[in-house]
Every structure is written in C-alpha cells, then in structure tokens.
C-alpha cells in the first residue's frame, strides 16, 4: 500500500513550502491523504483485510491530529489545503 516514489515526489513538490521540504504539515497531510485513498480502494476489494483496516484507522487519526495542529497554527493555509485535497472542515 506504499506510494511509489514518483507519486510521492509529485505530492511533495506540489505542497512543499520550499524545495526539499518534506516535513511541513501540509506535505505530511497530503501524503497521508494519498495513502488513505489507496488503502480505501484496497479495502473496497478486500473487505476482510482487518490488519489493513487498522492501519487505515491509524493513518486517519494521524492526519486528523496534523489537521488540528495546522488549523490552530495557520488557518489560511489550513483552509487552502483542505480545499485542494477535497477534505471537509468540521
């Protein structure tokens, strides 16, 4: 379920604050969203893959924490990011 390096590099390039930025919350959230999307598609096919389902729940929780951090830290970046990724605001 891991992202291939070309797709990962494309996501990092799109959401990075500067060149070589892989640790900013925006990049981390975008990468987690891509992994969550892939795992969701996998689980639509393999409904009884419970270990992958647990991994999906962990990824969703991690993304939720990062989104909460970004919302408190920089709301304008947060709102721009969720609109680009197609996420909902609580």
From Swiss-Prot:
It comes from the Bacteria. InterPro entries: Ribosomal_uS15, Ribosomal_uS15_bac-type, uS15_NS1_RNA-bd_sf. GO terms for molecular function: rRNA binding; structural constituent of ribosome. Gene3D superfamilies: 6.10.250.3130, S15/NS1, RNA-binding. GO terms for biological process: translation. The keyword RNA-binding applies. Keywords: Ribonucleoprotein, Ribosomal protein, RNA-binding, rRNA-binding. One of its GO terms (cellular component) is cytosolic small ribosomal subunit. Belongs to the universal ribosomal protein uS15 family. HAMAP family: Ribosomal_uS15_B. Part of the 30S ribosomal subunit. Forms a bridge to the 50S subunit in the 70S ribosome, contacting the 23S rRNA. One of the primary rRNA binding proteins, it binds directly to 16S rRNA where it helps nucleate assembly of the platform of the 30S subunit by binding and bridging several RNA helices of the 16S rRNA. This is Small ribosomal subunit protein uS15. It comes from Campylobacter concisus (strain 13826).
């Amino acid at each position: 379920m891991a992202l291939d390096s070309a797709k990962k590099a494309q996501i990092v390039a799109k959401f990075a604050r500067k060149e070589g930025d892989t640790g900013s919350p925006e990049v981390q959230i975008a990468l987690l969203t891509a992994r969550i999307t892939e795992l969701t598609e996998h689980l639509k096919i393999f409904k009884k893959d419970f270990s992958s389902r647990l991994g999906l729940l962990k990824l969703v929780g991690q993304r939720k924490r990062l989104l909460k951090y970004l919302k408190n830290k920089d709301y304008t970046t947060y709102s721009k990011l969720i609109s680009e990724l197609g996420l909902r605001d609580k």
